[in-house]
UniProtKB/Swiss-Prot annotation:
It is found in: Cell membrane. Keywords: ATP-binding, Cell membrane, Membrane, Nucleotide-binding, Translocase, Transport. This is Spermidine/putrescine import ATP-binding protein PotA. It is a peripheral membrane protein.
Length: 377
């Protein structure tokens, strides 16, 4: 679709000329007969906050471990700061890593844990005090500098590990779900602070997470992975609004998947008829043009559905379930063909409450109904 092609050209123009911090070239990692990562190629640029996002077992942590040097690729090349990392041990790579395990020194207090790398590097004492103080303030540990890890909660221990990695100002910081032990409020606050810090110091962050909201909040770009392969690489808005395939559409937020057969095609628009006889208009992104008679899937986000309003596509439905979510209400709707539709309505205005069993119409615009094409990476 032209709007996606235009968006990707603009993104490419922004990236062009920026030095590459980490390059993965046709990287494959096998453990015996199991392929954890398959033919992965990525360019991650200097100063970029880049996330590897996917479900458990998709290969994202294995990818991070290959960049860090804890795993060697079976095939392909890992390049950091223009230098091949083949045979380079972890401690000689210009990266620091924060994994889910804290790995703190139990006999050292918070200050000394954070300062450990600086002391080994011969940083002057005054500079150590200043930088450790800044790092502790960043992760909300000011006043905890003289506590031992045994006197800290799990979340506080994770923040010490994060501060210790940041204080050395590496060229690339690798993070494997470092905020997982924090409570929800602090986690959201730390997301913004991590992003702000990354902008301030210019360090490339490569962040592994299964949390879609976390990735969307912090990332400049995201690589969505599944079964060892990259499904799509894009900025957060493009991933959400223009998913490349069904997996990305399903994994990034909620979506309604409509299956049908193409009846007509005109430009980027197509008419789809579902198995239940619904006739719907949709658009084909990525330059993909379905053929008449072709079986396709289309995706439309719940917030794009309007209950009781007009639109390109209007479907009679029955309210099956109502879920109050605070800022919005979620409606589970039963379509005439027996399919299920999910709609979200913002609770920002007075509106008649709908009840289960009530007959309603639900509408959405064709431009918000995307025919899902082939895989993109």
């Amino acid at each position: 679709m032209e709007r996606q092609n235009t968006a990707e050209r603009r993104q490419g123009a922004r990236e062009e000329g920026r030095p590459v911090a980490v390059r993965l070239q046709n990287v494959t990692k096998r453990f015996g007969d199991f392929t954890a990562v398959e033919d992965l190629s990525l360019d991650i640029h200097e100063g970029e906050f880049f996330s590897l996002l996917g479900p458990s077992g998709c290969g994202k942590t294995t990818t991070l471990r290959m960049i860090a040097g804890f795993e060697e690729p079976t095939e392909g090349e890992v390049v950091v700061a223009g230098r091949s990392m083949r045979g380079v041990p972890p401690y000689r790579r210009p990266v620091n890593t924060v994994f889910q395990s804290y790995a703190l020194f139990p006999h050292l207090d918070v200050f000394e844990n954070v300062a450990f790398g600086l002391r080994r590097a011969g940083v002057p004492k005054g500079e150590i005090s200043r930088r450790v103080g800044e790092a502790c303030a960043l992760v909300k540990l000011s006043g905890f500098e003289r506590r031992k890890p045994s006197r800290l909660s799990g979340g506080q221990q994770q923040r010490v590990a994060l501060a210790r990695a940041l204080v050395n100002r590496p060229k690339v910081l690798l993070l494997d779900e470092p905020l997982g032990a924090l409570d929800l409020k602090l986690r959201k606050q730390m997301q913004l602070e991590l992003k702000n810090l990354q902008h301030e110091v210019g360090i490339t962050f490569i962040y592994v997470t299964h949390d879609q909201e976390e990735a969307l909040t912090m990332s400049d770009r995201i690589a969505v992975m599944n079964e060892g392969r990259v499904q799509q690489v894009a900025d957060p808005a493009t991933l959400y609004e223009l998913p490349a395939n069904r997996f990305v559409a399903d994994f990034i937020g909620q979506t309604n998947i409509l299956e049908g057969t193409v009846e007509a095609v005109e430009g980027e628009r197509a008419v789809i008829r579902t198995a239940g006889g619904l006739r719907l208009e949709a658009v084909a992104p990525n330059g993909f043009r379905p053929a008449v008679g072709e079986a396709v899937e289309a995706a439309v986000r719940p917030e794009k559905l309007r209950v009781g309003e007009a639109g390109d596509n209007v479907v009679a439905a029955e309210v099956a379930e109502v879920v109050y979510l605070g800022s919005s209400t979620q409606y589970i709707l039963r379509a005439p063909d027996g399919g299920r539709l999910v709609a979200h309505r913002q609770n920002d205005r007075e509106a008649a409450a709908l009840r289960p069993g009530e007959a309603v119409s639900v509408a959405w615009d064709a431009r918000h109904c995307l025919i899902l094409g082939g895989k993109r990476g």
